Regions:
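Hydrophobic alpha-helical segments
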Residues: 1-419
Length: 419
């Protein structure tokens, strides 16, 4: 396809009380000069992981793909060295202190066929960990280095909702946050001891966000730590921000029904970006829950991805959008893959550069690497269905990151997009 750029003016108009904007946009065409992506490694497929809950952790420079897997009726977390084999497998324990087994050996006591959430990684007490919750109501945390069980705590209700890791009380140390589907919110420290446990009085259906904007001074508000949750009571949805003691700081009723959401920083203070089932993007001020803007992206639905300097990147139906965090102005739209749904875009530093570039992959496994102006710098395909966002790690040892994609059958794929 010849490179083409079609420019159109941005049109904003009042659309109800919230002032919904609808945009025409700068459309950036696919560039024939783009690098063709190359698959440099694939793992074996695994049972019990469709890729949506897998994460990547780098230990001493070596990347591990961490997945929740099922084998012989037992749910486990498995770590696979990128470019190598299985490093450890740890059964999802019941708190009996079960440890990891190298490769596919047996570990400690396990929950039979436990239904679990997606995984999350972060640093607790100076060590890299991986955490999940179970449907039966446990928060389970492992050391990412060797798979040893760090702690298991009761969430206070049924869960299997992905937890979050961040400094929610502003003390300089990260906590783990888990929710129960009945409305419980639990934050624990690096040892598994409670920081707070609250109940917001309504079902929680989305993963919590660990709000940590301690270094932000733009908002003029010194309370930029806490936990954000989305609750649903029938057709009514609400966003609540809890402070570091578990008290509700504010409650907001967004115009959109949130399908995905992220936190992001901006020159005017931190915000929560909500992708609605109606195709609208709505942002709420972390300071007080007020709506900064709502804009229709002409896609249904939209998946909110990573945010970079001044922008948030959103996946739609065959589209990637770059939207200003300040006012909702659409900077550009890139189309690919027809009407195939695009997963939430990620930001990563690739090819030895010093700026993070947006990367998107759609449900058919087609991927694009874009620059800040929406131009395509690399493209390719992993040849399989993908439900998750791309992740990043240095696979080849050349000092630059490659893409890590996990497909619907649990196969981890490393993709080189360098020139």
């Amino acid at each position: 396809m010849d490179r083409r750029v079609l420019f159109a003016s941005l049109i904003l108009f009042a659309g109800g009380a919230a002032g919904v904007g609808v945009a025409l946009f700068a459309f950036v065409g696919v560039d024939d000069g783009a690098t063709e992506a190359e698959i440099v490694w694939e793992s074996d497929p695994v049972t019990g992981d469709d890729g949506s809950g897998a994460v990547v952790a780098t230990m001493d420079g070596d990347p591990l793909v961490l997945q929740s897997v099922a084998a012989n009726g037992t749910r486990s977390v498995r770590a696979t060295a990128v470019g190598g084999g299985v490093e450890w497998t740890s059964p999802v324990g019941t708190g009996a202190g079960g440890g990891a087994a190298p490769a596919d050996g047996d570990g400690g006591e396990a929950v039979e066929a436990a239904e679990t959430s997606g995984l999350v990684t972060g640093t607790l007490g100076g060590e890299q960990v991986v955490a999940l919750t179970t449907r039966s109501g446990s928060l389970v945390v492992f050391d990412a280095d060797d798979g040893s069980e760090r702690f298991v705590v009761d969430t206070g209700g049924r869960s299997a909702v992905r937890p979050a890791i961040g400094d929610v009380d502003g003390d300089g140390d990260a906590e783990v946050v888990a929710v129960s589907t009945s409305g419980g919110v639990l934050a624990v420290d690096a040892g598994g001891d409670p920081v707070f446990q609250s109940d917001v009085g309504a079902p929680i259906e989305r993963r919590p966000l660990a709000i940590d904007f301690s270094g932000n001074k733009a908002s003029g508000d010194d309370v930029t730590n806490g936990v954000a949750v989305v609750t649903a009571d029938g057709d009514e949805h609400a966003v609540r921000l809890l402070d570091g003691d578990g008290d509700v700081r504010w409650t907001a009723t967004p115009s959109v029904t949130p399908l995905s959401w992220r936190q992001a920083d901006s020159q005017n203070g931190p915000i929560l970006a909500l992708g609605g089932t109606n195709g609208n993007l709505e942002t709420l001020e972390v300071a007080d829950g007020s709506t900064r803007y709502e804009i229709g992206l002409q896609d249904l639905p939209v998946a909110v991805g990573d945010a970079g300097p001044g922008r948030v990147y959103v996946g739609g139906s065959g589209s990637v959008w770059a939207v200003s965090l300040l006012d909702g102005e659409v900077s550009w739209k890139q189309q690919f893959g027809g009407d195939t749904r695009v997963n939430a875009p990620s930001l990563g530093v690739l090819g030895g550069g010093d700026e993070a570039d947006p990367v998107a992959i759609n449900r058919e496994g087609d991927l694009l690497v874009l620059n800040r102006n929406g131009g395509v710098t690399a493209r390719g395909s992993v040849g399989a269905v993908v439900y998750a966002s791309p992740q990043f790690a240095d696979v080849t040892g050349d000092g630059t990151d490659e893409l890590i994609v996990v497909t619907e059958d649990g196969t981890a794929v490393a993709v080189d997009v360098s020139d």
